[in-house]
Structures are given as C-alpha cells and as structure tokens.
Amino acid sequence: MTWTIAKSLRLGALGLFAAALLGGPALADGMPKRGAVKKTETTPEPRACTLSANVALATEYIFRGFSQTAEGPAIQGGFDATCGRFYAGVWASSLDWGVVERRGVDDTWAYMELDVYAGFKGKHGHVAWDVGVIYYAYPNSTRNDFGTFDERFRNEYVEVKAGLSGEVWKDGTLGVTVFFSPDYQYETGDVWTLEVGFAQALPKHWGLTPTLSALVGQQWGNDGAYAARVAGGEDSYTYWNAGVTLGFLEKWSIDLRYWDTSLDRDFCSGPTFQCDERFVATLKFTY
C-alpha cells in the first residue's frame, strides 16, 4: 500500500514529539511566576501521592489492531502510582501467541505481557501534556529449543512517548500521542507510531456514565523485517477503533469496542495475530 501523506504525518509527529519533550514542562500548571513566591515560604508544599489498582476481563486482547490472544479471552491488571507530576505503573495481560515445539515438548510461545512505564504529566489551561517511557516484556518468549536465550526470539522493546490533549467543547476531548521505539518488537528496527483519539462524555442515565470514544493510529517502519512481520509487506499500516465505555457503581466499567486495520485480509488470517475487524468487550474494576 502507498500512503501519500505518510511523510507529512511523520514530520508532524516529529515536531509534536520534540515540542512535548522540550516545551512540555514549561506549560505545567503551578510553575512559579515572577513575584508569586512569598519570601516567608522556606519549603515547597508537599505533593499528594496516590496508588490505584485495576483488574479486567476481556473477550480478546487487541494491541494496535493485532490480536494477542488468538481470538481468545484475556485477564489483565495493573498498579498505578502518581506523585505530583510524576507517575509510574505496571500492567500485565495473559497472551496466546500459539504453541511451538521445544525439545520435543509443546510449549506456549508467550503466555504473558508485562509492561512497566513511567513519566511526567501536567496541564496548562485546557491543554494537558504527557511524556514517558514504556518497557514491554514477554517472559518466556526469548528461549530457543534448548531453553536458553536466543536473539532471534527477542520480543521485548522500549518506547518513548509524548502526547497533548485538550477539551475542544463541553466534555469533548481530543488527544494526539507520538510513540517511538529504536528497536521495535521482533527486531524490526526503529518504528514511529502516531495516534489521534477523541472522547465524548455523556450525561449519566439509569446509573450508567457513558463515554463515546474513537482512535486512529498510523505506524511506520523502515526495516525489511518490519514490512515482513508487522505491516504485510508495506512500510506502514493504519488501525482504528470506536466504542462506548459505560461506568457504573463508581469503580466498575464495561467497554464495547470495534477494531479494524488497513492490512490485507490474507495477511491478517491465521491461527494467531489476527488483524481483521472484530468486536471486543471488557469488564474492568478499579480501586
């Protein structure tokens, strides 16, 4: 496939990434202003720290358009800590990447994804910014037939991200996030990902708090391995989703979502990593 706007989007993504990294902290709420700090203040005001946890059950785990559970269900959960503008967390999900034979015994290629992330976020007026780093790990997926580490099976990778979001009208939020990995999954070289999302909160009815949301993502890679393993022979692909999240009983939510990609249906078919259209339901509890 050929994307005529790929180059302009990539340049825009680079500009947004640099602006968020270099200019983000200067936009933060609460930054000292000239003459605003009283001379009698000798210590900064303590920043509140919070800790939360979540657990979810999904009919399928989709990541950037690809099924991570071979069209099967997933159990997921994580912990998040926030202290001032700094945040950090860990999140995990069950996986089903298929079965391979190791030393004559069937073994699951990868049974779990474990993400560790941290960053800084703030707000200036109606615009929020977020810069961070994410480490994606897949325990057990880097073994060869002898059970030892093998570079050919390397799947873990690191991404840095920068995002901006803001309210465009009452309860309607538009956000743009850029991700970059210097060595993406499956040893596929440097990869850029641009996501644009929108969410609209609706009035509460019958004890339900609905939010409509949609997201479009575009990913680019410049390595032959990326084209062969991720983008169906091309140097980029597009993915999108749209759905509704229903909050209830304060800490519970149900998300109903439609996913699809621009990838060829022949490339998307198979026993694992399906990337055609599908519907996903997720029940989540946060505390």
Show the residue positions of the predicted features:
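Cleavable N-terminal export/targeting peptides
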Residues: 1-50
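Short glycine/proline- and aromatic-enriched beta-strand/turn motifs that initiate or cap beta-hairpins
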Residues: 29-98, 219, 278, 284
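Surface-exposed loop and membrane-interface regions of Gram-negative outer-membrane beta-barrel proteins
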Residues: 33-36, 86-155, 271
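Residues that define the transmembrane beta-barrel architecture of outer-membrane proteins
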Residues: 49, 71-75, 110-114, 127, ...
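Transmembrane beta-strands of outer-membrane beta-barrel pores
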Residues: 57-63, 83-85, 92-96, 122, ...
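Repeated loop/turn-to-beta-strand initiation elements of outer-membrane beta-barrel proteins
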Residues: 85-90, 125-131, 169-176, 204-212, ...
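Detector for outer-membrane/organellar transmembrane beta-barrel domains
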Residues: 155-232, 258-259, 285-286
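Outer-membrane beta-barrel "beta-signal"
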Residues: 246-250, 273-287
